[in-house]
From Swiss-Prot:
Pfam assignment, any one: RDD
Keyword Oxidoreductase: no
Name assigned to this protein: Uncharacterized protein YczC
Native source organism of the sequence: Bacillus subtilis (strain 168)
Species lineage: Bacteria, Bacillati, Bacillota, Bacilli, Bacillales
Keyword Ubl conjugation among record annotations: no
Assigned keywords, A-Z: Cell membrane, Membrane, Transmembrane, Transmembrane helix
Intracellular or extracellular location(s): Cell membrane
TM annotation in the entry: 12-32, 36-56, 85-105
GO cellular component: plasma membrane
Membrane topology term: Multi-pass membrane protein
């Protein structure tokens, strides 16, 4: 399995942002701006979706699936656990305050970000 580099991961993240924005925007048109429906959809897209999708058979978000990436356990390449997903998710939110966290993937041997190292996960190109 080949490790996924910074650019592929950045493309997957960009796709996920576009997908989330489109879904939230559609919810705004459907439910009306600021409605409970929009808030629920936003919570689902910004919290639930990126937290739980790595636990599915896709092993990642739709953006990662489209680019052909999977989030797996570092040592075994198997599906990650819920605690690992939580660690990845919480640490990944640091990028909201510092986009530099993703640059570690460009400089580490296993192309890992800080949240990958903390959760003991890696991102691979899907076969």
């Amino acid at each position: 399995m080949e490790l996924a580099g910074f650019m592929l991961r950045a493309c997957a993240l960009l796709l996920d942002v576009i997908i989330a924005a489109a879904v939230i925007l559609a919810a705004g048109f459907t439910f009306g701006d600021g409605s409970a429906g929009v808030i629920i959809v936003a919570i689902l897209m910004l919290i639930v979706y990126p937290l739980l999708m790595p636990l599915t058979n896709w092993k990642g978000t739709l953006g990662k699936k489209i680019i052909g990436l999977q989030i797996v356990r570092d040592e075994t390449y198997k599906k990650i656990s819920f605690p690992q997903a939580i660690v990845r998710y919480l640490i990944a939110w640091v990028h909201v305050f510092s986009r530099l966290i993703y640059l570690t993937a460009a400089f580490t041997k296993k192309k890992q970000t800080v949240h990958d190292m903390a959760a003991k996960t890696i991102v691979l190109k899907a076969e």
